[in-house]
Design a protein with these regions (language model features):
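Catalytic machinery of carbohydrate-active enzymes
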Residues: 1-169
């Protein structure tokens, strides 16, 4: 079964989607997962992903993965689900539910190559783990500096940074 998984949005959403891909692959190891995204590097080297395409180069997928084959496609928007908006469920729980799989606390996967590890480990010599926090995002063409449904309030960001600053770089 071919699963065409479309992930529209920013790099943060793409990274989060890898947790859902892991959940899908765990429950459906027979699926070949083909990702269409604006951020292909997020999925590179991920063993759960069979193939990666951008929205600019996916025209030939029809004959490769759809025509005369079993397939399903997910082009889902978990941010717009009422359970996420109201805080009843996490984004991961909502997304897994939309994909008809159980969410079992899977975490995002971002797999670096040995060359990348060698190159960047020289730049980040530290005795503490690195903490990355993406507080705001979105499409730069939307002209939205802040979006209540997407971005963390600045005072919350400050609290998070102050809480973790001694333990992380």
């Amino acid at each position: 079964m071919n699963l065409i998984f479309q992930c529209r949005g920013g790099i943060g959403k793409a990274i989060m989607s890898t947790a859902i891909i892991t959940a899908i692959k765990k429950q459906h190891p027979e699926y070949k997962i083909i990702v269409i995204t604006s951020h292909p590097s997020v999925y590179r080297n991920n063993p759960d992903v069979h193939d990666i395409h951008t929205f600019e180069n996916f025209q030939h997928l029809y004959y490769k993965y759809v025509y005369n084959q079993e397939f399903i496609t997910y082009s889902l928007e978990p941010y717009e689900h009422s359970d996420f908006i109201t805080g009843k469920k996490s984004l991961y729980e909502v997304w897994a539910e939309l994909c008809n799989v159980k969410y079992d606390n899977e975490w995002p996967k971002f797999i670096l190559t040995e060359d990348e590890i060698k190159k960047y480990s020289k730049l980040y010599k530290t005795d503490k783990p690195i903490f990355v926090l993406q507080t705001h995002g979105g499409n730069p063409n939307q002209n939205l500096d802040y979006n209540w449904a997407r971005d963390l309030p600045n005072n919350t960001v400050e609290e998070i940074i102050n809480h973790y600053k001694d333990d992380y770089n």
